[in-house]
Amino acid sequence: MPTPSSGLSCNGVAVGPVLRANDLAFSRGGRPVFTGIDFSVSAGGVIQVVGPNGSGKSSLLRVLSGLLQPASGSVSWLGKCVRAGDPAYLQSLAYVGHADGIDTDLTADEHLRYAARLTGLHATNETVRVALARLGIAKTMHVPIRTLSQGQRRRVALARLALVWRALWLLDEPLTSLDDESAACFHDLLDEHLRDGGMAVIATHRLLPGGGEVLQLGGAHALPPA
């Protein structure tokens, strides 16, 4: 199991805001996508980002991950403003986009080992198996990903979260293509992450159970819980 990093919580009690967005704005083609985004997340906290298609949910996550630059505003981590390519910040986050980001010619085992190497870690056969088991997909670890269903591929992508500890999860529609049993596996993984002092910012079209703050983009409208 991944080992939580230190300095974010004490005996499971949050020590104050760790991630903060300050008046964030993002534009595409000269047109504003969102403006005036302010929020903070402490250890054990989760923000659910909701809104209609085109409201900027995915763009916000990509700004937070450093893949896009904001038009204005700032992101701070542990009280320090995050600069482009900040290694300390990037090594503290895990990003799972709406697309799975998987080379389908690899097996699930090969994909997770490669993902671990990118973080400077060596994944053993057992750590990969355990990570896949957390998402209920360990039996397919040596099967080419191209032969898996969309739901199975999504679970392989999410298994990266169980393989390598990262304090901040940035997740774009994590439940896409998941059945109820697989969604329950993800909820258990998320709950454990938050109990261990982790944080998450999750873009979703359907509110996840378990609470947390809700950040509405693109105007108010009601969303049913998952």
Swiss-Prot record:
Topology relative to the membrane: Peripheral membrane protein
EC id: 7.6.2.5
MF (Gene Ontology): ABC-type heme transporter activity; ATP binding; ATP hydrolysis activity
Biological-process GO terms, alphabetical: cytochrome complex assembly
Matches recorded under InterPro entries: AAA+_ATPase, ABC_transporter-like_ATP-bd, ABC_transporter-like_CS, ABC_transptr_haem_export_CcmA, P-loop_NTPase
The keyword Nucleotide-binding appears for this protein: yes
GO CC field: plasma membrane
Main location: membrane
Stretches assigned to coiled coil: none
The entry's keywords: ATP-binding, Cell inner membrane, Cell membrane, Cytochrome c-type biogenesis, Membrane, Nucleotide-binding, Translocase, Transport
UniProt similarity note: Belongs to the ABC transporter superfamily. CcmA exporter (TC 3.A.1.107) family.
Identification of the protein by name: Cytochrome c biogenesis ATP-binding export protein CcmA
Upper lineage: Bacteria, Pseudomonadati, Pseudomonadota, Betaproteobacteria, Burkholderiales
Gene of this entry: ccmA
